[in-house]
């Protein structure tokens, strides 16, 4: 509770009781990674990842049903086995999509946060945050879906554009840890620096680019889990 709210409550309430709820944290067994990039680069990097290693049991989260529809449609055109889950679907349609996803007939599920809350599937190999959630706890709920398998391990990849850097920094502060930033391959062009204090949610601009082969957070122990060209070894 913010200090000002606590002070106000004490002035207007008589002997108030304060209940503290434990803050949820993702399992340590989840390897959390991020790409710092420009918004148009997100799809290109995602396509490259899926081309290098066939995606299986992947959930991609996007911020709105319109974006979910667009992303699913684009991935279908790229010949990926994908389905969309959003609020415009009838209940029977949602159930059919989930049935196909659980059975393995669909490799990739693109979904919004609200609709995806009812998804309870084990052995999700990868969670992709194509857009960053506004609430850090939504981030925890998202990536937690990839740690429900038999070994409790999982992989989460988050794409962070300039306008999302401040949001992502809040997530890192909430987690009390720095998420490993995967170096972007030079083939995708220059990428922005990770400067969340400069490029907040309401600050727009191209940002100061850097060459994508420059390494960031190179001291992270998670580097040993990365393949060549900075890609995760497994998808």
Positions of PLM-derived features:
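Conserved helicase RecA-like core
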Residues: 1-193
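Basic Arg/Gly/Lys-rich low-complexity intrinsically disordered segments
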Residues: 103, 174-235
């Amino acid at each position: 509770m913010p200090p000002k709210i606590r002070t106000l409550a004490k002035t207007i309430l008589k002997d108030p009781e304060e209940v503290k709820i434990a803050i949820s944290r993702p399992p340590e067994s989840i390897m959390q990674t991020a790409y710092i990039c420009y918004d148009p680069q997100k799809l290109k990097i995602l396509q490259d990842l899926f081309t290098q290693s066939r995606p299986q049991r992947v959930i991609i989260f996007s911020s709105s049903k319109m974006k979910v529809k667009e992303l699913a449609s684009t991935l279908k055109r790229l010949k990926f086995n994908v389905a969309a889950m959003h609020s415009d679907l009838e209940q029977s349609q949602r159930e059919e999509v989930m049935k196909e996803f659980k059975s393995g007939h669909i490799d990739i599920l693109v979904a919004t946060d609200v609709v995806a809350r009812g998804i309870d599937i084990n052995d999700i190999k990868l969670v992709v945050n194509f857009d960053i959630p506004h609430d850090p706890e939504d981030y925890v709920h998202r990536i937690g879906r990839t740690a429900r398998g038999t070994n409790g391990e999982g992989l989460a990849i988050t794409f962070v554009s300039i306008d999302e850097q401040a949001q992502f920094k809040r997530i890192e502060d909430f987690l009390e840890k720095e998420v490993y930033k995967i170096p972007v391959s030079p083939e995708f062009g220059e990428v922005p620096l990770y400067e969340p204090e400069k490029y907040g949610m309401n600050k727009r601009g191209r940002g100061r680019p850097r060459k994508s082969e420059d390494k960031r957070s190179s001291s992270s122990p998670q580097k040993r889990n990365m393949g060549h060209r900075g890609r995760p070894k497994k998808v």
